[in-house]
Amino acid sequence: MADVIITRQSIQALILDMDGVLWRGSEAIGDLKAVFDEIGRASWKVFFATNNATRTIRQYVELLSTFGIHAQSWQVINSATAVTYYLRQQYPHGGPVYIVGEEGLIEACAEAGFYHSENGAVAVIAGMDRQVTYEKLKIATLLIRAGVQFIGTNPDVTYPTPSGLVPGAGSILAAITAATGVDPVIAGKPKPTMYQIALERLKILPENALVIGDRPETDIAGAQQIGCRTALVLSGVTNSQQAALWQPAPDIIANDLASVIQLLVSE
């Protein structure tokens, strides 16, 4: 749907978002087995980077496997990874943090030395939480109003499902901001941290990585900041009219992941 200004030979690795690129909820987007067979024939390295921190890395590896995609844990990161990267820089000795989030975020923090507690919390960390309660929001609000740092996983206000767009992490953050007047420090995309981690693990330069995502203001913006090539797919939260307005324009705009791969292999 857009002029392709990159070639198959210039790309060494694909960095893929998941929600809206690989699947919507529990439904695969297209024939993922065929897509990844084509990726394998092209000999591209593959990495997965999602802003969704609800699952652990182990759970994401297992989920990918159910769709016929085989990945190792080093190939997968989420915004919880970026949160712990930031926390280690700010609080190298670890400590208590109050978490509004799900298992993926809580476990990642614990593994990094930050345990979930409101007592003496050095930070409030919030992300997507499908079990959010008034009590959780109240505690987070009181801590932030008392001067505790507010950190958000990612600003995505919606999340693509087969039923349509539903509230995402950004909606939780917005509620806390409304009650405190404090904007969170965002750790995940569009901050480039997740992509920097991916490039380090892949051992490649930014210009040799193609980032494929469905949300321009996070997936594409973060990649563009550090010089990665970008492909915006219309299988998630963005339609063609919205895609056409995004500046700077992605290198590729396509209907879905399969279309991106087909454009590249036909070059």
Listing of model-derived features with the role each one plays in the protein:
Residues 2-18, 23-44, 53-77, 84-267:
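Asp-based, Mg2+/Mn2+-dependent phosphohydrolase catalytic module
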